[in-house]
Every structure is written in structure tokens, then in C-alpha cells.
Amino acid sequence: MLSVDYENFDLISYLYNLVRQIPDGMVSTYGDLAEALGDPVAARSVGFMLSINKEPDYIPCYKVVPHDGSVGNYTHPLGSAEKMRRLIRDGITITNGHISNFEKVRFREFKTDYPLRKLRELQFKIGRLYDDRNDYSLDTIAAFDVSYKETRGYASKVVYNKGKIGAYVYSSDSMFPYIPGYLAFKEFKFIRALYDNETMILIDGNGILHPRFAGLATHAGVSLKTASIGIAKHLINCTVKGSDLLISGVVAGKMIGHHTIVSPGNRINVEEAGRLIEQREGKEMRSLLRLAHNLTRLHIETNGNIARYDFSTRNTAIQSS
């Protein structure tokens, strides 16, 4: 379903190339750069990507300012004072911490392919491929969790198979930051790397409960051609009617209790996913996600050098993929 190019897309470098287009004597805003990436929702993520810029003399992030024309912060030992010095050096006038004639020196004419637009188009396609037939088996259940330390991603998979539990870990760099609605492009590559033909996969995230009906669990289930369920802890922007969660008038998820949000990823419908997770087997499935989360934290703490993990009564060897 997805090409390797999309799975490993380096959005950070793409942004840095946009920043390098800003001429001396001009500035752009975080929102301007988000628009150039293809979605204004990425503005906060633009700030994060600029904050980890390790080459400030090559990538002139001092030319990026808040939307109100204030100078703003600068990740430099001298802070905003150094940012003002560089802007003044470029010929920009600053008065009381704000750029004079802001709109006249504001640059928006980026040469861009709007990559986030293309990713949204792909999500619409994936959403349309969601299969709501209850075509699933619980023979092998895999729960996935991914966490990050700067741009390094640490993933874990806990598998339940015929009464036995296995655990696997994988780590890799991720050059795609968190952007609301685009989590799959940050995390799916980790799930693909660990996936081994399990018949049901559980994802810490949403399925069709997503603006384009293509959350991480749907992205993974459709791409891997397997059944999947998304289990999340935080509610996205949707309509709540009792236990039903609606996107654009369509029931796309269920609220189980006060803290569990369930949405089908693939090969299962909303009602069946909610029923399955609410019953006894579902509680056991949720425990697999908790184990995967704990394993991921340990994976990070050991900088990817984990050798063993004790599941209370089980001393389970970890296989690193």
C-alpha cells in the first residue's frame, strides 16, 4: 500500500530546505512554513523541528518568527538577543521586540510540493479501503507501542500465541515529527518492521476515528492486509453521543468506560470492536498494550540495548529486529 519513500519521508530536511529559501532581509512565520508543507495544523511541529536544528548557520531558523511579528524565541545560548542581532544584521528593523513593516518583509513564496497534501490524499485512499466485515481471528494477537527520544524511535511488540507471550523490539530514526492527523507517517514503519503475520494487531492510537478515517490502526491494518483495532486514551475532535464517537456524522468509535477509546482499524466493524474490547478477552488484549508500553519505556532507558524482560512470572527473551 505505501511506498518506502512515504514510510521514510524526511519531513525535517524538507522543512529545512524551505527555511533556506527565505531571503536575507525577510522573515516567515511558523504558520507560513506549515502552509508550505501543506497543512496549517503543522505550525507547532514546525517550531519543534526548528528547535532541534543542529546547523543554525546553515539552516537560518532565526528568520522564522511568530505570526504577530514578534521576534520570538531562539534555541541559541544567547537566546532571542542573538536572534535580533542576526535579523538586524540582515537589515530588518526591530522596535520593542517586534519587526517593523512586518508584512512588507514577510516571505511566503516558497517553492514547494506541499508534501502534507499528498499524504492527506493517500489517507483518503486508505480510509476508503477500510474493510468493515468481521473477518478476523484471535489465533495470534500482537500489541504495538512506539515512543521517542528526540528523533530516535523505540518500538515494542508483545505477541500472545496459544498461551505463550513473546516480545520483540526495534529502534530506528524517525525524521517525521508528530503532527495531529499524520501519526501513521511517523509510526507505521516501526509496526511494519516488527509485524510477522499476526492475525490481529492492537495499536496504541485510532483506527477510523480520524478526520480522514485513516488513523494509525487503519493505516497499518489496510497496508498489512490484517485485522486491527485502535485503542486510545485521549479523545480527538469528534461528536460524542452516549458511547458512540462520530466523525462527520458517521459512528467511527466507541467509548469504553471513561478512559478507553476503541475504533476499528481493519476487518472488523465498530460494534464488534467495541464488544470485543469490552469483554474479558478485551481486558487481556489491553494488558498486552500495557506490556508493550512498559517494554518500550525500558527499551528507551537502555538506549536500545535491552536483552531481557521479565513478564512477572515469565522470563522472556527479547528478540531485536
Curated annotation (Swiss-Prot):
Where are the catalytic residues?
61
Q: Which reaction does it catalyse?
A: Endonucleolytic cleavage at apurinic or apyrimidinic sites to products with a 5'-phosphate
Look up the EC number in the record and give it.
Answer: 2.1.1.-, 3.1.21.7
Q: Which cofactor does it need?
A: Mg(2+)
The ranges of region (Endonuclease V) come to: 87-318
Tell me the keywords, alphabetical order: Cytoplasm, DNA damage, DNA repair, Endonuclease, Hydrolase, Magnesium, Metal-binding, Methyltransferase, Multifunctional enzyme, Nuclease, Transferase
Q: Does the keyword ATP-binding apply?
A: no
Query: What are the recorded Gene Ontology BP terms?
Result: DNA repair; methylation
Record's protein name: Bifunctional methyltransferase/endonuclease
Q: Which organism does this record belong to?
A: Thermoplasma volcanium (strain ATCC 51530 / DSM 4299 / JCM 9571 / NBRC 15438 / GSS1)
